[in-house]
Structures are given as C-alpha cells and as structure tokens.
Amino acid sequence: MVKSTSKDAQDLFRSLRSAYSATPTNLKIIDLYVVFAVFTALIQVVYMALVGSFPFNSFLSGVLSCIGTAVLAVCLRIQVNKENKEFKDLAPERAFADFVLCNLVLHLVIINFLG
C-alpha cells in the first residue's frame, strides 16, 4: 500500500514537472516573483515570532505589502497567460500597466498605514 502511494506521488510530481517545463518563460518569471514575495512575508512572520512585533504597524505593513504584491502578480499571471480564454483580448502591455498602477496604489496605502 505504501509503495503504490509513493509511486503515485512520484508520478504526480513527474507529470507536474513535465507540464511546467512547457510553461512560457515570462510566466515562470512571474511565478518566481510570487514565490519570492510569499517567502519574504514568511521571513517577516518568523522574525516577528522570534524577536517581537513592537512596531506592529511596520510588521503589518511589510506582510500586507508582500502578500498584496503576490496577489497582484498572480492576477498579472492570469491575464498574461495565453491559454486563458477570459483575457484573450487584453494586451500584455495593458495587463502590466494595470499591475504597476495597482502596485502603486497598494504601496501608497501601505505607506499611509505606517503613519
């Protein structure tokens, strides 16, 4: 029973890797950016757990900035993906401009929250 489960998991990872290798480079770069943003948020949470969160507004601002940026990057990835039929008429330049504008608004709110 355990061997078949292990074999199924290996087959699953192999199929995911082969499917992801066909992903365009621009989507892989966006994926890397999302992973970096989430990893940065996790580092901030671990730091807060170990050291403390004295300036709590700063901690919240940093984590919300990372998570908000990751969410906006996922939205960009959805819009730029050529296989997505919902955003077929949307130009990649327009999607990137929306991403930049939303990031600007997000970070203005974050800076305002810092006080």
UniProtKB/Swiss-Prot annotation:
One Pfam family from the record: DAD
Pathway the protein acts in: Protein modification; protein glycosylation
Summary of the tissues where the protein is detected: Ubiquitous.
Entry-linked InterPro entries: DAD/Ost2
Keywords attached to this entry: Apoptosis, Endoplasmic reticulum, Membrane, Transmembrane, Transmembrane helix
Topology term for the membrane: Multi-pass membrane protein
Keyword Nucleotidyltransferase recorded: no
Intervals, Cytoplasmic compartment: 1-31, 77-94
Main location: endoplasmic reticulum
Residues on Lumenal side: 53-55
Superkingdom per UniProt: Eukaryota
Protein localization: Endoplasmic reticulum membrane
GO biological process, one term: protein glycosylation
Segments traversing the membrane: 32-52, 56-76, 95-115
Role summary: Subunit of the oligosaccharyl transferase (OST) complex that catalyzes the initial transfer of a defined glycan (Glc(3)Man(9)GlcNAc(2) in eukaryotes) from the lipid carrier dolichol-pyrophosphate to an asparagine residue within an Asn-X-Ser/Thr consensus motif in nascent polypeptide chains, the first step in protein N-glycosylation. N-glycosylation occurs cotranslationally and the complex associates with the Sec61 complex at the channel-forming translocon complex that mediates protein translocation across the endoplasmic reticulum (ER). All subunits are required for a maximal enzyme activity.
Assembly behavior: Component of the oligosaccharyltransferase (OST) complex.
Name of this chain's protein: Dolichyl-diphosphooligosaccharide--protein glycosyltransferase subunit DAD1
Organism annotation: Arabidopsis thaliana
Species lineage: Eukaryota, Viridiplantae, Streptophyta, Embryophyta, Tracheophyta
